[in-house]
């Protein structure tokens, strides 16, 4: 039987684009681990994705994961849009390159060994873990230490 793990995530951006951060909580039974990091120039969507990626990549064995995010972009992207993007060679319906393809590919890889149930939670609505992740993400965004090397400003 697979370990049952809960992951809660949030991303933040002070300006969009601008300094950003992510926060994630990984919970297995009574044990919790938190993750956060800040980036000098990024977007809110990239930080939402990074939160999920980092937490999923921290899992060392296949797990049954319930991942809660307040990002419809992440949830819809990974459960619905990604299938056609892959069929089209990472292009959108109007033949444009998929934005944040580096992170979509990384997220796609990160979920392969797990059974993931994606849950959407309303942000800033008193969901305790989402609020904690929001604080982690905002604190990280306020003190960015890394460059988001995959971020490509739109020209």
Swiss-Prot record:
Gene Ontology MF terms: magnesium ion binding; nucleic acid binding; RNA-DNA hybrid ribonuclease activity
NAD in keyword set: no
Superkingdom of origin: Bacteria
Transmembrane intervals: none
Catalytic activity: Endonucleolytic cleavage to 5'-phosphomonoester
GO terms under cellular component: cytoplasm
EC class (word): hydrolase
Enzyme Commission number, as recorded: 3.1.26.4
InterPro entries assigned: RNase_H, RNaseH-like_sf, RNaseH_domain, RNaseH_sf, RNaseHI
Binding site for Mg(2+) 2: 10, 134
UniProtKB keywords: Cytoplasm, Endonuclease, Hydrolase, Magnesium, Metal-binding, Nuclease
Cofactor: Mg(2+)
A family per Pfam: RNase_H
Subcellular compartments: Cytoplasm
Residue numbers binding Mg(2+) 1: 10, 48, 70
One GO-annotated biological process of the protein: DNA replication, removal of RNA primer
Chain ranges of the RNase H type-1 domain: 1-142
UniProt remark on cofactor binding: Binds 1 Mg(2+) ion per subunit. May bind a second metal ion at a regulatory site, or after substrate binding.
Function (record text): Endonuclease that specifically degrades the RNA of RNA-DNA hybrids.
Family under the similarity heading: Belongs to the RNase H family.
NCBIfam families per UniProt: PRK00203.1 (NF001236)
Official protein name in the record: Ribonuclease H
Organism: Serratia proteamaculans (strain 568)
Phylogenetic classification of the source organism: Bacteria, Pseudomonadati, Pseudomonadota, Gammaproteobacteria, Enterobacterales
